[in-house]
A protein has these predicted regions:
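Conserved N-terminal alpha-helix of the aminotransferase class I/II PLP-enzyme fold
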Residues: 8-56
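Conserved active-site segment immediately N-terminal to the catalytic lysine
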Residues: 163-183
Length: 205
């Protein structure tokens, strides 16, 4: 994708219209119609309600997790998660537990405490892949939010939709789910995106 001539030609045309940089923060002058159009298209493509662009996948993980998780919350995360997920969890100051790779946590959060389960979909170092059904069931049973870093699944697995494709095809009830995808892997560009329920994406915005 990064060297596809059609992509390069389109980028060249758009640069002449919109310029090279945003010249401001997103809340002021840093967004244009292209940002909104891309968010809408990515949300529709993955079957999610809404999407929010970030400048990188690393910052998407930090921004989303640090905004949603408080010190009073509990976080359960795979022991082989990417550094961006580990950094984000540590920055929240929350109570956190690392569970065995590709398993589910052995104990839930205390009653009355909000909890999150954070994992990658495809682990970058060895290619291991999660079982979305097992994690979804755990989150339903324990009222946890499921956060999935799909950097290495999006654009490759699930007809290109990544883990979102598998989650859409799960039968029965689904937990609250957030998915982070990157634009710099299979799509050959740059940036990160957090996808999920509109009310959460609006909060992050």
């Amino acid at each position: 994708m990064s060297s596809n001539q059609r992509v390069l030609d389109r980028v060249s045309r758009e640069l002449k219209t919109f310029g090279f940089g945003s010249a401001g923060a997103a809340l002021l002058t840093g967004r244009c119609t292209l940002h909104s159009e891309l968010e809408l298209k990515l949300a529709d493509y993955t079957g999610q309600e809404s999407a929010l662009l970030f400048s990188s996948g690393y910052l998407a993980n930090l921004g989303a997790i640090c905004s949603l998780v408080s010190k009073e919350d509990w976080v359960f995360h795979d022991r082989l998660n990417h550094a961006s997920l580990i950094d984000a969890v540590l920055m929240t100051g929350s109570r956190h537990r690392r569970y065995p790779h590709l398993m589910v946590p052995s104990n839930p959060a205390p009653i009355g405490r909000k909890s999150f389960l954070i994992t990658e979909s495809v682990f970058s170092m060895d290619g291991d892949k999660i079982c979305p059904n097992s994690l979804s069931n755990y989150c339903i049973e324990n009222n946890s939010t499921l956060y999935i870093d799909d950097a290495h699944g999006f654009g490759v697995l699930g007809e290109g939709q990544g883990v979102a494709y598998e989650l859409k095809n799960l039968s029965g009830e689904c937990p609250e789910i957030l998915i982070m995808i990157t634009l710099g892997k299979a799509l050959g560009s740059s940036g990160g995106v957090v996808l999920g329920p509109k009310r959460i994406i609006d909060f992050l915005t």
